[in-house]
Amino acid sequence: MTTYSDKGEKAAAFYCSKMGFEPLAYRGLETGSREVASHVIKQGQIVFVFSSPLNPGNKEMGDHLVKHGDGVKDIAFEVEDCDYIVQKARERGAKVVREPWVEQDRFGKVKFAVLQTYGDTTHTLVEKTGYTGSFLPGFEAPRVKDSLLSKLPNCGLEIIDHVVGNQPDQEMLSASEWYLKNLQFHRFWSVDDTQVHTEYSSLRSIVVTNYEESIKMPINEPAPGRKKSQIQEYVDYNGGAGVQHIALKTQDIITAIRHLRERGAEFLAVPSTYYKQLRENLKSAKVRVKENIDMLEELRILVDYDEKGYLLQIFTKPMQDRPTLFLEV
């Protein structure tokens, strides 16, 4: 997951101190990269890259930052046959931003290619068969180690569960069809505005996934309501379609959120009336929540449930000044 930022080093440090990540790799002037500095961080199997332009002539990154602010530019997929996927995607009409190319260092070779998806977002295909480096060719170990990080509590975030892309009205279907057509994904789940709505706003959503269902990409669009929806607000502030939030999975959300709050991570406020209503609703529900509701209320963790089971979730405040990208645990 690559985010463009005009302060990549500071953004990476923020995610490390507040969200429990650790520095993994670096590329910049010291490593021979004259155009872009990239700071790579990792937690569990989650890898984020924060990239910043190094000179005023970098029009592509400059234009992206002016239009969108700090935000996700690229979602990388590790693949087994980069050439085949690019060939099939091109035959089906996908825009190939960059044809397959190879980079190498003493740890081996890696093949890449880049495809265009919704908005200005791209997917980099990464074929790294046999590569033994800690990240990718051209990157080195972080130059500086923050001694404070080892003193902070572990957060236990493990993998990326899903990545949500928000679209302008009437563009959800074409964005989701792109994945079905070009990457051979299939539809996993969908809802319309009769199913997800409040008195004031609503949304439509289609979730697409790969064959193994290990990658899930919800695609949302706003639906008409009495007030501007969260989806429309995102589209307005982002200057079009883009990644709205990244969901990170943990096996122990109680400990994770307690530790994240101790680190200073900020989450959306939840009124106490939510938990009062939740207790009432659960009395007649078929599902039984094993966690202590008082504990969930203390940490402001939400409960989403139906007759098949439940999940616990919480949303951060926006991770930058614009009310665009946020995280879900």
PLM region spans:
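Active-site-adjacent "gating/activation" loops or surface patches in catalytic cores
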Residues: 54-55, 212-231
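Core segments of cupin and vicinal oxygen chelate
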Residues: 2-47, 91, 100-106, 114-117, ...
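Active-site-adjacent structural elements in folded domains
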Residues: 58, 145-150, 192-193, 225-233
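Non-heme Fe(II) oxygenase catalytic core, chiefly the N-lobe of the double-stranded beta-helix
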Residues: 126-180, 184
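An N-terminus-focused feature that recognizes amino-terminal "leader" regions
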Residues: 1-142, 162, 169, 296-297, ...
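Long compositionally biased, domain-poor regions of proteins
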Residues: 215-217, 238-319, 325-329
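Short, structured motif recognition centered on aromatic/hydrophobic residues
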Residues: 1-5, 15, 21, 41, ...
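Generic recognition of stable, solvent-exposed alpha-helical segments in well-folded globular domains
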Residues: 6, 10, 36, 70, ...
